[in-house]
Amino acid sequence: MTARLTRRPGGPARLRALLDSGQTIVAPGAFDPLSARLVEEAGFPAVYMTGFGTSAALIGRPDVGLLTMTEMAGHAGRIAACVDIPLIADADTGYGNPLNVIRTVGAYEAAGAAGIHIEDQVAPKKCGHMEGKLVIPAEEMVQKVRAAVQARAQPDFVIIARTDARAVEGLERALQRARMYHQAGADALFIEALTSEAEAEAAVRAFPGVPLLFNWAEGGKTPPISLDRVKELGYRIVIFPISTLLAATGAMRRILREIAQAGTPAAAMSELPTFAEFVDFIGLPQVREAEQRYAVGTGPRTGSQTGADDGGDI
């Protein structure tokens, strides 16, 4: 993997091609650009921008609907700009009614996301594995999905409809809602917080040929089913939204404890990348190359390049 200074175009088309290939897309969660780069370095075909992790990273607060659409789309743009793999992003409830959803789709597309999921929770929403969720009427969500599908400028931009109704209305009603959302034009479905492997299997059986997303969340309501089994069941997208966030939190706690107790992180240095390795990873060689390429005096100078239109000094 080589660090880029600009975003690679065509994310929606590449995500659509992955969906059309029949393979299961494994997309670990990223909570910032650095974690997204690590997902890419590990060889995954796509990355997922976690709303839970974004809320924790940006404002240090839980995922309870505190972030705005512009904050979320802006964060998606920063992540998309630093990786070559497609970005699937959490777009919460779409941030309002169908008119708001139209603006949301445009903002995430402009940011460089390859696809988004929107959910049928009442705003302000909660993390899908928290208690106390409420859902809007299914017919209202249908209009949001229709608006999202019709608003996208790129036909390949992937719209994933998520239902949180399992925890509120039960599995059968959640499946009914998901069917309505698919009929409204959603490209894929996300039935959140299933409570057993049997429910996960039932969801796939209910939608033959329709891409379904499986949410593998540590400590959540869905049991820890192996990735091989999730693939065997037929899920087409698998996200691990908080794995990197929890791992980073644990690692930072360990190093901070070492500094607090020993006065130095020396005991943990063998587990850390070196400074040189880290700056190479985040793209310093590419920055240096660009500095040399565009350094003053390395190429012909014209009035327009120097800012002078008469050949004089500026």
Where do the language-model regions lie?
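Alpha/beta enzyme core
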Residues: 6-18, 25-214, 220-235
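A general structural signal for well-ordered secondary-structure junctions
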Residues: 24-25, 265
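Short glycine-enriched loop/turn motifs at secondary-structure junctions
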Residues: 20-22, 241
